[in-house]
Amino acid sequence: MLRSLHSSSSSDTDNNSGGCKNNGGGGGEAAAAVEGGGDQRAVAAAAPSTRDLLLACADLLQRGDLPAARRAAEIVLAAAASPRGDAADRLAYHFARALALRVDAKAGHGHVVVGGGAARPASSGAYLAFNQIAPFLRFAHLTANQAILEAVDGARRVHILDLDAVHGVQWPPLLQAIAERADPALGPPEVRVTGAGADRDTLLRTGNRLRAFARSIHLPFHFTPLLLSCATTAPHHVAGTSTGAAAAASTAAAATGLEFHPDETLAVNCVMFLHNLAGHDELAAFLKWVKAMSPAVVTIAEREAGGGGGGGDHIDDLPRRVGVAMDHYSAVFEALEATVPPGSRERLAVEQEVLGREIEAAVGPSGGRWWRGIERWGGAARAAGFAARPLSAFAVSQARLLLRLHYPSEGYLVQEARGACFLGWQTRPLLSVSAWQPSSS
C-alpha cells in the first residue's frame, strides 16, 4: 500500500510554495534521486513518500526536466499498479497518470488532454453515479435551488440561466417545488430554463427530459439550449470566434439566442462553472455581464482549497498546486472509501471518469485557477457590484437533512461561514455554495 498523499497539516502545503525543495527535504531528496537518473531501486532506497514523488514530478516538470519527471511518475504508477487499490493507491494512480500525460504533452509525445481549465466531460452514467454515491453535487443543487426558490417567490414568470446545465438533474426538484407553491387561484408560474453547455446533443436531451417532467406536473415550461464555444466559456448560440474576457463581457443581445423579457424574474446559476474562466479580468468581465442582466439572485458553487489555496488569483507554482489538489482529492477519495462499498463499479466509474478527469484538469496548464475559493469568488462578486444574499436557515437545515438521510457517515460536515454554506469531510471544507444579488449602492 502506498503511503498517504494527504499532508500532515495545512502548513505542509504552504511549505511547497517554492517547489519540492522546500518540502522539509523529502520532496527535494526525491527530486534529486529521480533527477540523478538512478533506477527505481535507488530511488526506493531513499524512501520518499508517494506525496514526495508526486511533488518531485511536478517540480521537475516545472523546471523542464521531462525525462526525470516521467521517471518519477512511472515509479508511482508502478507502485500503484491500477486504480483499484485502497484510497491512497487510487489517488496516487490518478495524480501520477495526470502528471505523466502532461509530461508527454509537453514533450510532444501526446496530445493535450484538456482544453482551457475544464475537465473532459464524463459519461452520463458516471455523472449520474457521482450524483448518487457522493453528496457534493446534490448538496450544491439543493442549496442553490433553495436560494433560487426564495428569490423568485411570487413571480409569475421565472427565467433560470444555468451556465453548466449538463444533464439537468438540478432542476426537477426546483420545478416541483415551484409547482407546489403556486397560488391555486392563479395557477403555477411560467418557468423558462436557458441551459448552457458545450455539447448540443446533450443539451437537446436535457431539454426533452425537463419538458416531459414539467408536463407531468402541469407546469408551463420552456427550455432553450445555449452552446458554449469549446474555445471559451462565454455564451454563444453557436460556437463562434469570440474568446476570453471580451466575449464574457459582451451584452446579452450579442449572445445570440440568449433572450430576456422585462417581466421575468431572472436567476443565474453558476454551479461548478466559474473556475473555467481564465483569470481575474475574465472573471470580473463575466460577473459584470451577469450584473447587467439585473438578476434577482446568482448562485455560485465551487471547490474549496481548504486554506491551502492562498490569496492569489491562480496557483501558478505547479508543486504547490499539486499539493493543494492532493489534499482536496485525498479527502474526497477518503469520503468515498468510507461511504461506498469496496469493489463498487459505480465508485470506479466515478473515480475514473469524473474525479480522474478533474485531477487531469487541475494539474493541467490552466488548472491553477481551480483553487480560488470563496474569498476570491466573493471578492470578485463584490467588485462587480454584487452583495451577498445570506442563505436562509431552512436552506442550511435542508443541506444537513440531505446528509442525514442519504449520506449518514459521521465524516461529512455542513458549516456556515462568510455568508456561504460549506460541505466538508472531517475538518476539510471541499465545496462552498453562496448566493448573491445586485447591491443597492
Swiss-Prot record:
Output compositional bias ranges, type Low complexity. 7-20
**Leucine repeat II (LRII): annotated span:** 205-256
The record places the motif (VHIID) at: 158-162
Q: Where is this region: VHIID?
A: 127-195
- In Pfam terms, one family for this protein is GRAS
- Residues in GRAS domain copies: 41-437
Biased composition (Gly residues) is annotated at 21-33
Its domain of life? Eukaryota
Molecular function (GO) terms listed? DNA-binding transcription factor activity; sequence-specific DNA binding
User: Which GO terms of type biological process are on file?
Assistant: meristem initiation; regulation of DNA-templated transcription
**Keywords of this entry:** Developmental protein, Nucleus, Transcription, Transcription regulation
For the region Leucine repeat I (LRI), what residue ranges are annotated?
Answer: 48-126
What is the tissue specificity? Expressed in a small number of epidermal or subepidermal cells at the leaf axils, in axillary meristems and the entire tiller buds. Undetected in the shoot apical meristem.
Q: Where in the cell is it found?
A: Nucleus
**A cellular component term, taken from the record's GO annotations:** nucleus
Q: What are the boundaries of the region Disordered? A: 1-33
What are the start and end residues of every segment in region (SAW)?
364-437
Q: Where is this region: PFYRE?
A: 266-361
Role summary = Putative transcription regulator that controls rice tillering by initiating axillary buds and promoting their outgrowth. Rice tiller is a specialized grain-bearing branch that is formed on the unelongated basal internode and grows independently of the mother stem (culm) by means of its own adventitious roots.
Q: What is known of its domains?
A: The C-terminal part of the protein is important for tillering. Mutant moc1, in which the last 124 amino acids are missing, is mono culm.
Q: What family does the entry list?
A: Belongs to the GRAS family.
Per its record, how is this protein called by name?
Protein MONOCULM 1
